[in-house]
Amino acid sequence: MEMAKEQELILVLDFGSQYNQLITRRIREMGVYSELHDHEISMEEIKRLNPKGIILSGGPNSVYEEDSFTIDPEIYNLGVPILGICYGMQLTTKLLGGKVERANEREYGKAIINAKTDELFFGLPEEQNVWMSHSDKVIEIPEGFEVIADSPSTNYAAIEDKSRRIYGVQFHPEVRHTEYGNDLLRNFVRRVCDCIGEWSMENFIEIEIEKIRNQVGDRKVLCAMSGGVDSSVVAVLLHKAIGDQLTCIFVDHGLLRKGEGDMVMEQFGEGFNMNIIRVDAQERFMSKLQGVSDPEQKRKIIGNEFIYVFDDEASKLKGVDFLAQGTLYTDVIESGTKTAQTIKSHHNVGGLPEDMEFQLIEPINTLFKDEVRELGIELGIPEHLVWRQPFPGPGLGIRVLGEITEDKLEIVRESDAILRQVIREEGLEREIWQYFTVLPGIQSVGVMGDYRTYDHTVGIRAVTSIDGMTSDFARIDWEVLQKISSRIVNEVDHVNRVVYDITSKPPSTIEWE
């Protein structure tokens, strides 16, 4: 993201840790903007970004392995404060002349450190519980460094070169298990990097509107509306920035929730006075998806067809150069980087055709889900719209496992409507992060009345989360679940069983496909 000159930035460099996004989250929660970049970022790009501080993340590699991730040692001469976490500390040690070796035993879990009072541990107790996750250890620190924390298992739990403002910690301050982790990160961000902490959604809107106007000029933009919160927020942000230069295309692909299409047209077309074209492409999508059961293939087909529909609609308009999408930061992260395996391709990331004729605008691709909701409120979108259930671009296409048919879509559509209605009636909308039904493609024997049935099973997925990167299954009252189950079985044709998904993320993702 292009940052305004006055915008404070903490740059997090990615070495493959599963906790990378948590570092970024923790810093943003302090009111300071933070971005995650690949460790191969050039010195020129770092200088252009002009960060107030740099954090080197943890990672699964060993620094002494031949193909281990590394950085340009010139980074330590930029005069910018640096904090190395776990692998980041070991890499700093190696590059600056210290020594690292494999530990006798891998240290994973809670540990106790003894810390000295310095800038990093300012105001914190000497003895602290921290979270360790490493199999290597520092055995000799570089010249100019001193120890600022130790533990029973290592003499070098934390180190510093005070004159150059370079720090390293062997533990993970970004995870909740580290007792004073947030305080340590805050000390680095506020005391060492001298950040004021003025980043807010109001500030983000000002910066993003200026960026959009500079990028677009007097040209036109198409916005892909899916009916979900993300694309809706993007549409309103763009409309605020460029007004009538924006045309929203709402593709009714037949994979929408019950009543979704009419709601979008009413709330945004009429409510926000936006130019929205509703395209009926149901037959087109169903034709392409016929016989397809692989989830990745379904996602890519849906992504491709979205773009081709836009191409068709854009050809009817003049001077359209840009396509706007509601891609989130979590979408980008989950689609994989050089240091992380792809979990699943995202419909806004992995499904784009190579011959796409539009330039992309993705104004919220640096925001997490809760930040997008905050942005929506700041933009004046009513709360009942901002707090609608997250809905993926592929829609119900990834909530029908296996091949998609009209009958299966109807089961998911009707069962999902019942689930949402009961959750709303029980006042649980704000307590549960996301909830929906899924058709797993399982049929089982049942008895309804005096007759044997062999019908579909509907799965209920309901999770609690803050940012969508991790989640836990929602502890919904059994009586509420029984009410939902009873209504689905009695009101939705060809369903004789309802199950509840009690898996967390990880190991599962929130969506089933």
From Swiss-Prot:
Domain GMPS ATP-PPase: residue ranges: 199-388
Reactions accelerated catalytically: XMP + L-glutamine + ATP + H2O = GMP + L-glutamate + AMP + diphosphate + 2 H(+)
GO molecular function: ATP binding; GMP synthase activity
One GO cellular component term noted in the UniProt record for this chain: cytosol
Active-site residues per Swiss-Prot or TrEMBL entry: C86, H172, E174
Ranges that cross the membrane: none
Keyword Repeat listed: no
Domain Glutamine amidotransferase type-1 per the UniProt entry, residue ranges: 9-198
Binding site for ATP: S226, G227, G228, V229, D230, S231, S232
The keyword Isomerase belongs to this UniProt entry's keyword annotation: no
Xref: SUPFAM superfamilies: Adenine nucleotide alpha hydrolases-like, Class I glutamine amidotransferase-like, GMP synthetase C-terminal dimerisation domain
Pathway: Purine metabolism; GMP biosynthesis; GMP from XMP (L-Gln route): step 1/1
Entry keyword set: ATP-binding, Glutamine amidotransferase, GMP biosynthesis, Ligase, Nucleotide-binding, Purine biosynthesis
Class of the enzyme per the UniProt entry, highest EC level: ligase
EC number: 6.3.5.2
Pfam family, one: GATase
Gene3D superfamilies reported for this sequence: 3.30.300.10, 3.40.50.880, HUPs (3.40.50.620)
Top-level taxon in the UniProt lineage: Bacteria
Function: Catalyzes the synthesis of GMP from XMP.
HAMAP family assigned: GMP_synthase (MF_00344)
Quaternary context: Homodimer.
Protein's name in the database: GMP synthase [glutamine-hydrolyzing]
Organism field: Staphylococcus saprophyticus subsp. saprophyticus (strain ATCC 15305 / DSM 20229 / NCIMB 8711 / NCTC 7292 / S-41)
